[in-house]
Curated annotation (Swiss-Prot):
Induction note: By replication blocking agents (hydroxyurea and aphidicolin).
The EC number(s) this enzyme carries: 2.7.10.2
Location of the active site: D372
Binding sites annotated in the UniProt record for ATP: I255, G256, A257, G258, H259, F260, S261, R262, V263, K278
High-level lineage: Eukaryota, Viridiplantae, Streptophyta, Embryophyta, Tracheophyta
Stretches for region Disordered: 141-169
Gene it is expressed from: WEE1
Protein name (record): Wee1-like protein kinase
Amino acid sequence: MFEKNGRTLLAKRKTQGTIKTRASKKIRKMEGTLERHSLLQFGQLSKISFENRPSSNVASSAFQGLLDSDSSELRNQLGSADSDANCGEKDFILSQDFFCTPDYITPDNQNLMSGLDISKDHSPCPRSPVKLNTVKSKRCRQESFTGNHSNSTWSSKHRVDEQENDDIDTDEVMGDKLQANQTERTGYVSQAAVALRCRAMPPPCLKNPYVLNQSETATDPFGHQRSKCASFLPVSTSGDGLSRYLTDFHEIRQIGAGHFSRVFKVLKRMDGCLYAVKHSTRKLYLDSERRKAMMEVQALAALGFHENIVGYYSSWFENEQLYIQLELCDHSLSALPKKSSLKVSEREILVIMHQIAKALHFVHEKGIAHLDVKPDNIYIKNGVCKLGDFGCATRLDKSLPVEEGDARYMPQEILNEDYEHLDKVDIFSLGVTVYELIKGSPLTESRNQSLNIKEGKLPLLPGHSLQLQQLLKTMMDRDPKRRPSARELLDHPMFDRIRG
């Protein structure tokens, strides 16, 4: 009886010990979990080994051993869950640790902050997904974790190499497609692109027909591109849209006029000097008209500076008109008799002949013929005669069309279209100019007077030496071969009186 009661008492005590053991384990588990959770909150989480934690209920009695042996069954049922809890492998606390219920809300991978003084400015911000540009991508194979570390390292490198090769192949495919598309559209140029290119293209480089050596100046760097957009080239240029003439010059008064142009005395605003600006009276719409008007500019530019030739400075098209900036002279030779009631002396005539002969010699040496020598085209500045108005200038080799000047000063061969001696035409015109200057009155349109002059039949000129009259007859000879050249005229002994 006592043995039976002792067994019953022992069983009750055993059950109570099991309950106490379970309760103590639960308490220790919760304490460890709370401690780790608090350490996580303060960024001081360290690996805590629960195996080294001292137990508060350690007993060495046999009774405790019985209790431990009886609870082994319960430990086997708990399995790996209890062992994991005892080893402290959890780094965070879940709601089921408190309420023993499954947690379906808390995500498995929580991004917990690791410190109290972390600023919000440094926290990562969510970004919108980036669109992938690759055509295809490979999925990384899941490697087995049973292999050694070297195998996993090699497999990861192999995957990276495969991905890089795949990206290279993709880039090559895209590059080939772009190149193919560009090749297909190589021959096509849109009208908008052509118009834009023409607006950005500089004006054309005109060929100067009066320049002998054009090895460098005849090259137009944009010539091969202008053929595509010739219709888009402007017929005139005016800088930034404003009038260059009104912007750069102050017009003073008109000093000359002709059939095709007018000449104004102007003051240049930039340098404060006086110039003569000549511009066409009518608008030049056609390309042939513009090229014809440009002949004077090109001839003056090809000649360059000479003391007995009117200086050339600049030219431009504006409002379909050609503007030429020239040297300003005092007056023309035709105005000389009007300025003085006295007739021109023979010495003054020799000075005029000598200076214009020097100008003609310089022009002829350049391979150019003036073809419009007359009193209106000879100017005087500070007592120096200057030859101007090269609108009818042409080449001596007949490479350019011949346009005759004033018919009153032209020899008969020009009227007969004989252009073999164009330099002698200028000598004839100079003789007629001097004859008109000695006479003191302009030539008339009288048929008889015109025929006598073209035949070289001059009346006597009282008050002048026979030597001068004979020189004039030689210069106005009907046969151009018997006329002196400009060089021969300069060497004539009559000019010895004015030399030195």
